[in-house]
Structures are given as structure tokens and as C-alpha cells.
């Protein structure tokens, strides 16, 4: 389905605006969003200090209250800290942890296997791998994804590399052991045609029903209609990345009347 990579709204003081956050989540759920991904890239996790990060995860899990699944951003380039956040998210009742590849350190493929194995071993929380080499400088190989998919707690991938040859090879190797979600709103339909499970979506912040409908049409095997709908919103999707995410999407939400802060 369509999981929203939800923004984090802030007050003018720089604190998280939980009152507005709640309204945004209610709107998302009412308009078809299938899951909430909190403290991801779009949620500015890398700009939150530890206390803010943990508070946002805990609050979101409590507020959503099982209406839809909650996926908590728990990744870090520090393996020990990623383990801490993953355990914390599990204690809060998150349904999965989204764990980005270790950035800046630029580890090897063997290092990626060691990093994610340690995280997946720390508790029973399902782990969704997050491949976004344009931000991290690190990219999984298909062989690495295959090795990681053997772990019972690693069962998902947010694919934001844009490399369909890599994805096709990985999906062929991993089969049902790895569920793949697009990390790019302009690639939902082609990825789902290969067997992908949907999208972790920036678009959903401003058009949740549209993102949901695109994925549902794919599930219903109505790919021409899904492609037509995706292309209908291509210019909007493109505009959401005219500057570094989440600047454009927060501006778009502001224009729609949401109080999102800086």
C-alpha cells in the first residue's frame, strides 16, 4: 500500500508541534494512507536530537493506536545507537523499524551485513532496510540484500536508488523473503509491476488518497489506470523535489493550510 513518509511539524520555538501532528495523522488515515512512517528522511530525523527522536516515535505509536501500522525510523551510522533506537521503537509498539544504510562511514558490503545482522538480532521488531545512496553514499548489492533477506527479522526494503536493474536482480534472488516498497513516488507503478508492495511516499503528505489509489490499482492488476493516475500527478511529484526534501513538501503543506513550521 501507500505509507506516508510523514513530515514533522514544528512550532516557531523549534519544538515539535504535536497538536498539529495529530491533525495531520488523522487526515492521513481518513484519506487512505495505509501506514505512518515517522522519523524518516521527510520527518527530518537527522535534525532531531535523541530526546526529540524518541518522543516522536513514542507519541506517534500512542496516537495512532493501531489504526494503521507505524514504521519508526531507527537507522544510524552508529550500530550501537541504531540498536538502541530499534529496541526503543519495539517497546513503544511500533510495527517495524526503518533502518537507513550507515552514512558518512561508507562501510563495505560485509560491513552492511554485520551492521544489519546486529540490529536484526537485538529484538523481534521487523526491519525494513532503506537504500538511498544519493544521501548516504552507500548502496546495497543484490547479493548483500539476498544475504540479509535470510534473517527472519529482515523482511523489507525501501528502494530509493532508482536502479531497476539492481532491484530486479535482488527481487529475483530474494523472492518472498524481501518485500520491496518504492522510495520514489514517480516509480510506484514500474516497481509494483515487478512485484513490489507499494510506496513509502512523500506525495502522500499532500495527496494521500492519490498515492493509496495508485497502489490499489496495481494490486487490482489495473496497471494502465495506475500508470495514468501516476502520470497525471507527475508534475506535482516532480515539484516536491525541486529543492532538498522536505523543504518543498512542507511548503506545499503550508499552502494547503497546515502549520508545519520550519
Predicted regions and their residues:
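Catalytic alpha/beta core domains of metabolic enzymes, predominantly
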Residues: 121-122, 135-241
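Flexible C-terminal active-site loop/helix
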Residues: 258-262
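GST superfamily/GST-like fold recognition
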Residues: 253-255
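Active-site beta->alpha loop and helix N-cap motifs at the rims of alpha/beta catalytic domains
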Residues: 1-4, 8-137
